């Protein structure tokens, strides 16, 4: 089946409109939430088993198809952190924080990455933000341990 130019333009316009209105590829392709949850389970399982390369493939897919899901972004960021790709991890943690609003876990992990990037002042700022603003007492204690 071949599409003519008008059909191609119509499809392109529909996809662009959907993306501009906040739709994800998951939405555009009508991928069910339970399928995304299953894929996340595989990614998480691979991560926990230390099969980082396989986990990365799944987390990348998840992020591409639903870039608003903080869990997917955190998963890929954690992969990058394990692979010592600290700048990429920190960048993704920043996105996760922006999407997650009041969860300071990504800020904590950004601080860890900044230490490995030899940016102790940036790391200190991250840990201080966690201590000042997080509601998670365990996370605050972890952050404080980096400052002591």
Where do the protein language model's features map onto the residues?
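Long, contiguous interaction/recruitment modules in multidomain scaffold/adaptor proteins
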Residues: 1-35
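A ubiquitous short alpha-helical element
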Residues: 27-28, 109-115
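Short coil/turn and helix-start
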Residues: 30, 49, 118-119
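Alpha-helical adaptor scaffolds
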Residues: 33-105, 113
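TPR/TPR-like (Sel1-like) alpha-helical repeat modules
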Residues: 115-138, 144-148
């Amino acid at each position: 089946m071949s599409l003519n130019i008008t059909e191609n333009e119509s499809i392109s316009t529909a996809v662009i409109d959907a993306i501009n209105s906040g739709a994800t590829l998951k939405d555009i392709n009508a991928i069910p939430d339970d399928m995304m949850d299953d894929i996340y389970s595989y990614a998480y399982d691979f991560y926990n088993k230390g099969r980082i390369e396989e986990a990365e493939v799944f987390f990348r897919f998840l992020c591409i198809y639903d870039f608003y899901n903080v869990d997917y972004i955190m998963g890929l960021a954690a992969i990058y952190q394990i692979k010592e790709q600290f700048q990429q991890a920190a960048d993704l943690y920043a996105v996760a924080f922006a999407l997650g609003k009041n969860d300071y876990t990504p800020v904590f992990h950004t601080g860890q990455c900044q230490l490995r990037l030899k940016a102790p002042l940036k790391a200190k700022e991250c840990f201080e933000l966690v201590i000042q603003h997080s509601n998670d007492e365990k996370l605050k204690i972890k952050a404080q341990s980096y400052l002591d």
